[in-house]
Amino acid sequence: MLSNGISEDDLFSFLSLHKKEDLDHRYILSSMCTLPHPVAVRAHCMFMETNLGDPGLFPGTAALERLLVERLGTLFHHKNAGGYATSGGTESNIQALRLAKALRPGSSPNVVLPESVHFSFKKACDLLSLEMRSVPLGTDRRIMADKAAELIDKNTICLVGVAGTTEYGMVDPIADLAKIAAQQDIFLHVDAAFGGMVIPFLPKPVPFDFALPGVTTLAVDPHKMGMSTIPAGVLLTREPDMLDALNIDTPYLTVKKGYTLGGTRPGAPMAGALAVLDYLGISGMKAVVAGCMKNTERLIAGMETRGIQPAASPDVNVATFVCDRVPEPWKVSWTRAGHLRIVCMPHVTADRIEAFLSDFGDMYA
């Protein structure tokens, strides 16, 4: 720490130098986060000092969190869902497995999940001492439900499906998994961190949420396609009081028990998430998702005309290609199998797709 403070001008000149080192969003094609919507930024600024971890001090902010859970529960066909605002998919997935373990205690617990799960499940299983049983994917890059059923035994505490895989943008056959979960009385967690704010707004959404009786919990990230400020995730539960199984005593706060993973929890991004939902509504979100899907289709078609084949036929706005290089200064990512991966987020507009295709064509000319 500095012995003496510096002037405000010098401070912000210093900060600006480092901010300039961050990448320009115009060239970011790999991220599942995006530029926040202006109403999210405005709402965030209104609630910057609030702490959801001590709701008795911020009852208005806590009421907005309950409203956000209700809004999303309704979107996912269960208005009376329980849940809370998390820091994102990683926390939501950890908490879902923590809940599953609490509800079915045992000496050798295991979790059955697809090979395509987000790396947060490795963290969760390490923290909770859970055995990971990975289910192979079919040729369509979705979990093979019949293989999942074969891996379930008396020590299985949770079955996991993904609605919008991080690498290829696929939606697992959640309906099939839900049937298995219901038949075997197994906790089913759906990781819809990405797809949760995409699938409901598609012309023909596939079933993946609480409309399926076997689904127990669901994770969704408003800071992805919901265009909230970061970090903004939500974990939803079928039963409104289900998370009480995780309660611990919090004697020196304004509430005496708590089940959240974080202690201090920012109200600002939660308010930003709710602001976007209420500002855009169903029709507005449909327009956003339609634009992203159109850009994804255009990107795939444009790459094919340049001789580059897609690695998958995605269910959401993630495009992958059999390709080993891209032009500078575009920032992309690569799947574990070595495929080029591009996420067509709201900031990846139609003109950016055309600019990328033009640069790509020049490089391969």
Swiss-Prot record:
The lineage of its organism: Archaea, Methanobacteriati, Methanobacteriota, Stenosarchaea group, Methanomicrobia. Pfam families: Pyridoxal_deC. The modification N6-(pyridoxal phosphate)lysine is found at residue 224. Catalyzes the decarboxylation of L-tyrosine to produce tyramine for methanofuran biosynthesis. Can also catalyze the decarboxylation of L-aspartate to produce beta-alanine for coenzyme A (CoA) biosynthesis. It comes from Methanoregula boonei (strain DSM 21154 / JCM 14090 / 6A8). Pathway: Cofactor biosynthesis; methanofuran biosynthesis; Cofactor biosynthesis; coenzyme A biosynthesis. GO terms for molecular function: aspartate 1-decarboxylase activity; pyridoxal phosphate binding; tyrosine decarboxylase activity. Its cofactor is pyridoxal 5'-phosphate. InterPro entries: GrpII_AminoAcid_Decarb, MfnA, PyrdxlP-dep_de-COase, PyrdxlP-dep_Trfase, PyrdxlP-dep_Trfase_major, PyrdxlP-dep_Trfase_small. It comes from the Archaea. Keywords: Decarboxylase, Lyase, Pyridoxal phosphate. GO terms for biological process: carboxylic acid metabolic process; coenzyme A biosynthetic process; methanofuran biosynthetic process. Belongs to the group II decarboxylase family. MfnA subfamily. Its EC number is 4.1.1.11, 4.1.1.25. This is Probable L-tyrosine/L-aspartate decarboxylase. The keyword Electron transport does not apply. The gene is mfnA. It catalyses: L-tyrosine + H(+) = tyramine + CO2; L-aspartate + H(+) = beta-alanine + CO2. It is an enzyme of class 4 (lyase). The keyword Lyase applies.
